[in-house]
Every structure is written in C-alpha cells, then in structure tokens.
Amino acid sequence: MDVTEVPWRRLPQFSVSSRASWLVSSGFPLSSYMFSHVERGKTFRLTLCFGVSRLRPRSAIPLRFLLSVFSEQPPSRLKGLCEVVWIVEADLAANEHLYVTGDPSTLGSWEPDCAISMYPTENDNEWEAKVKIASGVNFRYNYLLKAGYGSSSDVIWRPGPQFSLSVPSSVNQDRKIIIRDSWMSMSISSKSQESYGWGSWIDDAYLFPNCVTPAQSEDECTSADSAIEVPRTHLNDKQVGAESFLCDELAAFSSENSNLSALFSDNYQPIEEPWLIQESITLQHERNMQTDSEQDVESCDDNENNLNTDEQNHQLTETLLPDGGFFQSESIATTILINSSICTVQRIAVLEGGKLVELLLEPVKTNVQCDSVYLGVITKFVPHMGGAFVNIGSARHSFMDIKSNREPFIFPPFCDGSKKQAADGSPILSMNDIPAPHEIEHASYDFEASSLLDIDSNDPGESFHDDDDEHENDEYHVSDHLAGLVNGTVVNHGAVEVGSENGHIPMERGHSADSLDSNASVAKASKVMSSKDNKWIQVRKGTKIIVQVVKEGLGTKGPTLTAYPKLRSRFWVLLTRCKRIGVSKKISGVERTRLKVIAKTLQPQGFGLTVRTVAAGHSLEELQKDLDGLLLTWKNITDEAKSAALAADEGVEGAIPALLHRAMGQTLSVVQDYFNDKVEKMVVDSPRTYHEVTHYLQDMAPDLCNRVELHDKGIPLFDLYEIEEEIEGILSKRVPLSNGGSLVIEQTEALVSIDVNGGHGMFGQGNSQEKAILEVNLAAARQIAREIRLRDIGGIIVVDFIDMADESNKRLVYEEVKKAVERDRSLVKVSELSRHGLMEITRKRVRPSVTFMISEPCSCCHATGRVEALETTFSKIEQEICRQLAKMEKRGDLENPKSWPRFILRVDSHMSSFLTTGKRTRLAILSSSLKVWILLKVARHFTRGTFEVKPFMDEKTVNERQHQVAISLLKKADAIADSSGKKKLTLIPIKKEKTSGKQRR
C-alpha cells in the first residue's frame, strides 16, 4: 500500500531552550524507521531508513526529531507509573556494555558510574533496559558505551546529543513505551553520497521544514520491520489519513561532517539546534543499496500516481511553513523612539515589552562613520601588525588589515598587459566595465537539487575578511570562495609585475613561513612570496586605495579599515572581491532554497551576495530592484574614486583623501535593520526626521509608513515613556536585580568584568541554598544580556557567576544567556561556565559604547575610579619642600626662626582643611619639623591632590629682581641700536606709586 508521508515543521516549544535531540511521542502517521549512529575511527555515520512502497524514490525528508510513534488511543487510562523499555540494536565487542543515563530526577544521574545497565536479549546484538517512570514527566536521556567490568571499566564512547522523551500524563494499565534504536553499521557504496554527523548543529540544506505534533496518549513505539496502523490525526488544523502498510524497501539517508575530528566529551555538547543535520540528506534508491554516481539525486519515476503523491506532499509542506518561510522567534512588542536634535546628539531608543533594551547615540556633526567608504592614502606599512596605516582625513591615521591573497582597489589599478582586472581580481573587466543593473543576465529557474547544494559549497580556498560577521546579528552559512574563480570558471591571472620600490607588504597576518625571520625586511619577504600569492605586490607607501570603515575610533585608537568594502541594503549585503552566496540562518526550508536560487541568478560578476532575513517572502522583482540600487552605489563609488585619483595626479590640492560614500545615518540604519512587521510603531518628535523616515519607507516598505507616528505633545518623548531615569542609570556600576541580587560592571581597557552578587536573594541551606543561587544566576543572566546591549559594550566580557555545585544548573545558566542574547543585533558568542564559575562573552564592537559617549574621564581620578589620599598628598608636599631646600645656597640659622626659609604653598580646598584642622595643625607640625615658614593659600581652580610650592619673596627681593630685568633690557636695546645705526633709546624703570582708592577725575 501507499505510504502517506507527512511533512513536518519545527514547533516553537522545541526551540533552542535545550541542546537535546528531542524524542517526543507523536500521533501522526510515519513510515517505519531505523536510526543508526556508528563510530568508525574519528567519523560518525548517521543513517535513517524509511519504509517505501512500490520501489520508487520518495521526497527527501530530513530528520529533525527522533519520533516515538504510538498506535491508537486505548479506552481506559489511569495515572501512576509507566514502564519505559529501551531496545537497542548494537554490534558490540565481547567486553563492551551499553548503558542508559539521564536526568537525575528520573534516571538517577548523568554520571557514567550511576548509569542504568542494558542487558542482552534472546536476539543477537540486541540490548534491553526497563525502567518505571512517573507519568506526565519530560526527561532527557543518552547512551554510553563502557569497556571492561566493575571499577576498571572505561567509557569509550559517549555521543553528544541528548534525547528527550515526554511520558503521557494518563497511562493505560497494560501498555508501555518502547524505544527502539539501532546502532548497527551499514555500508553504502555511492560516490555521490555524502556523510554527515553531529559536528554541526545548524540546518543549512535543501530541506523541507518539519512539523511534530505531540501525541495525546501513551502507546507502544513501532518497530522498524513491522507494519502498523495509525489513526487519523490533525496537524495544524489539517487532517491527514494513513493506511496500514508493509515495508518493501529501505531508502538510506546518510550525512557526514568532515570537521568532526574528536569524540564528544562531557563538557562539549551541541550549543545550538543539535537535532538538525547539516547540509542535504541525499536520497539513495536501489534495491541493493547501490547508486550510480551520475544519477540525479532528485530523479523520479514516470509513474503518475507516484508523482501526484509527491506533489501533494510538497504542497502540504509549503502550506505548513510559517509565514514568510522562516522560523518565527518569540513575538515581543517592539517600539522605536527617535529623539532628534539640531546641534547636539540624536538619541534612538528601542523598547521591547515596554523596557529599554537598546540606546543609540549619534552626534549631529560626525566626521567618520562606520561603513563609510573613502579613497585614502597609505602612509606606512607595519608588517609585524599585518597591515598598514591609511590617511582618510581623520585626526589619527587609521589601521587597515591586509589579506595578501585578495587584491585591493588601488589607483592606478593593477594591469595585466592591456586588460584591466575585474572587481574580483581577474583580468576581464575594468572599473568602468562593471555591469549596469539592467544588463545583468538572469539564468533559468530550471534547476536540480544537486546544483542547489553546490551553490555555496565550492572548495574552500581563500578565507573571507575578518569583518564578515554581520552587525544585525544575521548569521550566515556561506562557503569560502575559491581563488582564481569567476562564478565557477577558472581564469588565468597572468604574471604580475614586481615593483622595485620599497614598501611592499610581505604577507597577511598569521601567514606561516618558516624560512622568514620575524624581523626580516619587507623587500626580503616580498622575494620569498610569489606574485600569485601576494596580490599586494605593487602596493607601496603613497598608493591611493579604496577603504571602508569597519570600526570607529575609540580613545587613542583610530578607526579600523578594510580594503574590501561591503555595501548593505534592506535585502542584500554586496561583498566585493568575493564570489560567495549566503543566506541568513534565520531563513530555512523552501524559502531558503528559493532565495539561494535567486541570489545565484542575480549574482553580479566578481561580487558575493548575502541574503538578509528581511528578504524572506519578497518577490524576485523587489529583490532585483534592491540589488540594482547597491550596484549603482558601487559604480558611483568607483567613478568618484577615479575622478579623485586623477585630480590628485594633476596636483589638485585636497583631492585626496576623499569621502566616496557616506554611510547611512543612525536613524535610517535603525529603520533598515529594525523596522519590520514585528515592530508595533516608530515614534519621532521631529517633523524633519518624520519626513526623512517616511520618504525612505515609501520606496522600501510602503506598508510600514502608517506605523510611523509624529510626537507633537507638550511633554518630551522620552519622559512620556519614562526612560530618562533608565538612561541616567547607564553610568552606574551597580545594577540591582529583581530578586535582591546585584551586578557590578567594571570597564577597563582590556575587558569588561561583571560580578554577580547574591545580596538578599541568598537564603536557606542545602538544596534551598543551591536553588536560591540558581535563581540569582538566572536573573543575572537575563540582566547581563540586557545591560551589554543597552550600554553597547563590545570586546571581551568576563562574568563571575555565583559558584554552583550542580553541573546541570550551570547548563541552565548557559542556556539562559544564549537565549537572552539572541535578539542582539551585534554578533555575540558565549562560552560555557568554567570550573570557577566564569563565563566569557565576546561581542562585536563597531562603535564606542554608550558609557564612553555620554561620559569622559575624571580629571581627579583619571578614569581609575579612585583619587589620591590626603595623607599621600601631604607626604608629597613635604618631599617637595625638602627638594627645594636642598637647592638653596643659604638655609638660615636653625636657632634663629626669623632666618628660616619661607615658602608659599597653594593647595585645593580639601587639602587646606586637612592641613589646618585640629589643635595642633599638620601645617604647624610640617613647619617646625623642616625649620621653614609656610604661607598657605587656597587655589579654587586646583583639583583634589594638586598643589604648588614656591619660595616666598618679599618686596625688596622682588624689586631687586625687577631692577635686574630692566638692566638686561637696557643692554639689549643698546646692542640693537648699535647694530642698526639708529639713535639710542634709553629705558628708565619707573617705580609705580601706590594710588588711593579714589581716583581723581
């Protein structure tokens, strides 16, 4: 009989809240399956077999979840214990034993010593374990393999993913849950077949989205070699029927990951969607499990009934897709507030659920902005830093990283004979030969599945530049482009002339060359590297080059540049000197495949493309129009660069450095990245900004214009939403938590440290103490993600959580942080907690933090947070007086106080109070101890810790010094008169008489 295959999709409740591979009971029809995971050396093989009838290939359905399939619901039920039986087919050695381990509350412990042993059954290579578990619980479990007996046994294999099982709340008396797994090796000979493992946890394949509906009852799982009859059930309000069937043939699916080089350890577990299999699951169909390598993996039989069945399944798959073709994240009410300013700083606040989560500040007059493109001049090469300094017109020269295997955009450009090189470095097109948007040829949409898999899976050649990570937190799975390829065609670069002048850049940072000394000269390094490898061979000091700002200057550091600009629009990211195709990981299923094909079709020669999340669901015409705008922008950039370079060669002053393309302002950037269908409204308080935003949306997203509101009330916008106080609290080091704990945030030059304090949230003993610590750490995890996003903290962040004894609690805290940072636009990476409770978080920094922009270093403490103690300043005053006494020729008679030296001491008000308080003041003690007279004066402009010590001079001494100065001036005047031959000018010093308070009229 025909087998009705139900397409699936991932439900929200099975999101990345756990790293487990979920094993959930299901009530919808599914073919018999056999799941195999076999280790051979350093390679894991994953095999899934579906029952197929009529000996025809079926549509490739990926394994998103391991399913426990149950039969129809029994009439009688009761609550209590349910027996769960694990039956595993495994080919083990004589001294090897299989165990089951799981959650401590259900299966005892995750530790190998406390694992539940599985015993061999009557059948060969079959192991069984029985456990009674309370009804209505959900628990995780896993398998492990031990070699040996007793205390001498060693764990030789422990897979990474953890499975999950939901036990129904009501249990039939004579029923039990049976879980069948097969770990038998299967040899499949196919050149075209690829093998994938659990080394990658992100889905990126030609896969249909799957749907799993939890079962409403507890029933027995089906075996891989038995026929079952499953009742009709509902999937997302769609009724799907099935008939009993007999398994006629097994179609094998396999996948592998070449990067998997080691077994999983206890500390290393999949961190993101571990139940997904990377890349495509290729369908293999032949009776003897052998496939011709030249056979199309998506070929189908000519049987019309079979084709109709596949088409129905495909239509149902598309119907079950979420809106937009990609997985929707948890919906949170988002509001964007824009507080405009004419002469100071424009403020943009992002509210999620009524709470301030992000604050963006943009000074009205900004010289350098991130993503702006300049024509700069190379001023100095720094081979030991792997880059060069470039003058782009800013106060400090900017650092540019160099990739020696990627050709830059320089003027004059590289030449190969009489041909100009294209944007990707091939001698095909000149700068003026970049295809216009309307000249792009569009390929046919007739494609095969195998070609889809090869769109972005070329052999990895050159690695992309370091700023490949997206600022809007769109993660991309794209393959490295192959050096020397133009959209898959091999071209000959030809010989590149080697320059004879100094200043050639030797190699990119991190390039390994054992024959080169680290202190070798640039010329020597250039000789070692071949011209084919070093595409910067003609670049030298004074070369004009197109660069883009990837990170704004911070403190004493100048901006960071890249020689390979990257232009962004609403739907695309255009990558220069690249041939890669990428799609946001937030898009999956059929929509992901469609966008891949469109991107490959529209890809301009010599450029790479990345599809952004917002592009999901948009038509080809909309995507092409958006890409045409990017190509036109790049053409304008190259034209401006050529004009500026020619003007500089003709001696025009100020021609370079030149701004070629100004980055989009903060306002429109937020509209582009944030403003979508999930945003409830955007409120602006300036008619000028309102017109700017609506004018931009008229072309990009007209349907969102009605969500833009103009605030014209008397109360300020931020006061209306009560966020001014939260902005004031950004400078505070201590952040209180809702449960009584607190965070202490310390920002240094190297990193940011965050300390979690328990405070009043700590109470109880034993288990209650551990529970209280967990609650504080979980609350801190959520607040930390909010604070680093709100303060725009970048770089390395080290979090010191309260120590926890339970490893599972550490896992919960780690998962909470991972979940909390998902909504951050910047790229955030989180490490697991260490033995000492430390977590390392890295966040991409593209601009100065909010704290840096709204504050400046303290003139007293110099940004250290501490000022000099008054006792220390008092000691310094004593040392300074002693230093000046040592320089004096006459120190006076110690027995005659009138002859003691006199000094004037100027201090701040705090130090003055410190010296003059008490019965016997510190000033008197200092004077009598050093045998000096001290005249104390308060300088109001002095900061704390500042003082000045000068010798005191009476009026007679001052007059004598003034007389000496006057005599020296007379001598200079006489000398000048003698040399010039003019009349002598005599200067007579006149002593000014004191005048009375009343002036005569």
Swiss-Prot record:
<comment type="function">
    <text>Involved in intercistronic processing of primary transcripts from chloroplast operons. The endonucleolytic activity of the enzyme depends on the number of phosphates at the 5' end, is inhibited by structured RNA, and preferentially cleaves A/U-rich sequences.</text>
</comment>
<protein>
    <recommendedName>
        <fullName>Ribonuclease E/G-like protein, chloroplastic</fullName>
        <ecNumber>3.1.26.-</ecNumber>
    </recommendedName>
</protein>
<feature type="domain" description="CBM20">
    <location>
        <begin position="76"/>
        <end position="185"/>
    </location>
</feature>
<keyword id="KW-0862">Zinc</keyword>
<keyword id="KW-0255">Endonuclease</keyword>
<keyword id="KW-0934">Plastid</keyword>
<comment type="subunit">
    <text>Part of a chloroplastic degradosome-like complex. Interacts with RHON1. A homotetramer formed by a dimer of dimers.</text>
</comment>
<keyword id="KW-0460">Magnesium</keyword>
<dbReference type="Pfam" id="PF00686">
    <property type="entry name" value="CBM_20"/>
</dbReference>
<dbReference type="GO" id="GO:0009570">
    <property type="term" value="C:chloroplast stroma"/>
</dbReference>
<feature type="binding site">
    <location>
        <position position="861"/>
    </location>
    <ligand>
        <name>Zn(2+)</name>
    </ligand>
</feature>
<keyword id="KW-0175">Coiled coil</keyword>
<keyword id="KW-0507">mRNA processing</keyword>
<dbReference type="Pfam" id="PF10150">
    <property type="entry name" value="RNase_E_G"/>
</dbReference>
<keyword id="KW-0694">RNA-binding</keyword>
<dbReference type="InterPro" id="IPR013784">
    <property type="entry name" value="Carb-bd-like_fold"/>
</dbReference>
<dbReference type="InterPro" id="IPR012340">
    <property type="entry name" value="NA-bd_OB-fold"/>
</dbReference>
<dbReference type="InterPro" id="IPR004659">
    <property type="entry name" value="RNase_E/G"/>
</dbReference>
<dbReference type="GO" id="GO:0004521">
    <property type="term" value="F:RNA endonuclease activity"/>
</dbReference>
<feature type="coiled-coil region">
    <location>
        <begin position="769"/>
        <end position="789"/>
    </location>
</feature>
<feature type="binding site">
    <location>
        <position position="755"/>
    </location>
    <ligand>
        <name>Mg(2+)</name>
    </ligand>
</feature>
<dbReference type="GO" id="GO:0009658">
    <property type="term" value="P:chloroplast organization"/>
</dbReference>
<dbReference type="GO" id="GO:0003723">
    <property type="term" value="F:RNA binding"/>
</dbReference>
<feature type="binding site">
    <location>
        <position position="858"/>
    </location>
    <ligand>
        <name>Zn(2+)</name>
    </ligand>
</feature>
<keyword id="KW-0809">Transit peptide</keyword>
<dbReference type="InterPro" id="IPR013783">
    <property type="entry name" value="Ig-like_fold"/>
</dbReference>
<comment type="similarity">
    <text>Belongs to the RNase E/G family.</text>
</comment>
<keyword id="KW-0378">Hydrolase</keyword>
<dbReference type="GO" id="GO:1901259">
    <property type="term" value="P:chloroplast rRNA processing"/>
</dbReference>
<dbReference type="InterPro" id="IPR002044">
    <property type="entry name" value="CBM20"/>
</dbReference>
<feature type="transit peptide" description="Chloroplast">
    <location>
        <begin position="1"/>
        <end position="48"/>
    </location>
</feature>
<dbReference type="InterPro" id="IPR019307">
    <property type="entry name" value="RNA-bd_AU-1/RNase_E/G"/>
</dbReference>
<keyword id="KW-0150">Chloroplast</keyword>
<dbReference type="GO" id="GO:0010239">
    <property type="term" value="P:chloroplast mRNA processing"/>
</dbReference>
<dbReference type="GO" id="GO:0046872">
    <property type="term" value="F:metal ion binding"/>
</dbReference>
<dbReference type="GO" id="GO:2001070">
    <property type="term" value="F:starch binding"/>
</dbReference>
<keyword id="KW-0479">Metal-binding</keyword>
<feature type="binding site">
    <location>
        <position position="800"/>
    </location>
    <ligand>
        <name>Mg(2+)</name>
    </ligand>
</feature>
<keyword id="KW-0540">Nuclease</keyword>
<dbReference type="GO" id="GO:0009507">
    <property type="term" value="C:chloroplast"/>
</dbReference>
